[in-house]
From Swiss-Prot:
It is found in: Cytoplasm. It comes from Bacillus cereus (strain ATCC 14579 / DSM 31 / CCUG 7414 / JCM 2152 / NBRC 15305 / NCIMB 9373 / NCTC 2599 / NRRL B-3711). The lineage of its organism: Bacteria, Bacillati, Bacillota, Bacilli, Bacillales. The active site is at C11, C83, C90. PANTHER family: ARSENATE REDUCTASE (PTHR43428:SF1). GO terms for molecular function: arsenate reductase (thioredoxin) activity; protein tyrosine phosphatase activity. This is Arsenate reductase.
Length: 134
């Protein structure tokens, strides 16, 4: 099915939140959406993000940490910024690209429970979007 829409999850380092969002997006939206993630910088996938997603039986070890790709950004049907930094510093998007902000705390460098909490919050938010389109 090539008529898929494209959703692009952005955060600062494409290390934690956007990686989890990409994985949840593929799980909940993969049949209707092409799901990508990127960051203002590429910090590498955080090992705790991998561990947190493994806890819910989602393997993100093969996901890569990428800098924002202008081609994907310019052709995306929906761009979702996941942290205040990416929302304020995100490259300008063309008028036809729908851009929304879903703020989540950055778990990097915090206690393990923060990774679990943020993982679950992102999962619930994307699950809601998959059902309601909001």
């Amino acid at each position: 099915m090539e008529n898929k829409k494209t959703i692009y999850f952005l955060c600062t380092g494409n290390s934690c939140r956007s990686q989890m969002a990409e994985a949840w997006g593929k799980q909940y939206l993969g049949d209707k959406w092409n799901v990508y993630s990127a960051g203002m910088e590429a910090h590498g996938v955080n090992p705790n993000a991998i561990k947190a997603m493994n806890e819910v039986n989602i393997d993100i070890t093969n996901q890569t940490s990428d800098i924002i790709d202008a081609n994907i950004l310019n052709s995306a049907d929906l761009v979702v910024t996941l942290c205040s930094h990416a929302d304020s510093v995100c490259p300008s998007t063309p008028p036809h690209v729908n851009r929304v902000h879903w703020g989540f705390d950055d778990p990097a460098g915090k206690e393990w429970s923060e990774f679990q909490r943020v993982r679950d919050e992102i999962g619930e938010r994307i699950k809601r979007f998959s059902k309601t389109g909001e």
